[in-house]
Amino acid sequence: MNMISLKDDLRGNSYPGRGIIIGRTPDGTKAVAAYFIMGRSENSRNRVFVEDGEGIRTQAFDPARLTDPSLIIYAPVRVLGNKTIVTNGDQTDTIYEGMDKQMTFEQSLRSREFEPDSPNYTPRISGIMHVKGCTDCDVQEKGHYNYAMSILKSSNGNPDSCCRYTFAYENPAAGEGHFIHTYMHDGNPLPSFEGEPKRVETMDDIDAFTSLLWENLNEDNRVSLFVRYITIATGAYETRIVNKNQ
């Protein structure tokens, strides 16, 4: 699979919806995660990301303007031990609870389907990062890192069928990541993402990567962005959050 330009891909798509990027920095030392949300309606745009423990949650920027909290208020990021979960809905909690009971990522999602927002039937996209630092391994090692991504979507808009796809990446290559988003592009109804997660570039500098993403998301539709870099050897992390509403 050819690597695509994140800048060009984002700039050329006014509405990819919600998106997850997971990968590894070019120097190989850090795991990379990013999650963004976009909105077309006032209800969807009336949101911000806020920190919540080691993760984040969405909340209404102006509570008085919140008309329907379902599907838009949730925890996109939660941390379970050395696992970081990133999703576009409350399946974050489903994965967290399942893996806490020794279920796999894929098994945990078996109880979930795409969102019930007819006629779009928005896909549920999810990612899991497993960063095993040197506190868990031989002192000579620099830690282990792998990740997986999932999409649950309707069968070409048919709500009677759910298509389940999981993509696993072991010992991911330095300098690249994978990008999955809910919609192919704007439309009515919105067309679900198709194919494998896109192979994209990463950057060593978290601020530069955050700027690359935010500046190339459609200015009218972008709402919030979360970026996290995790040092693979130690598990230490740093986070950036950008909200359009301030």
Language-model features: where?
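Conserved short alpha-helical segments that host acidic/polar catalytic motifs at enzyme active sites
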Residues: 1-246
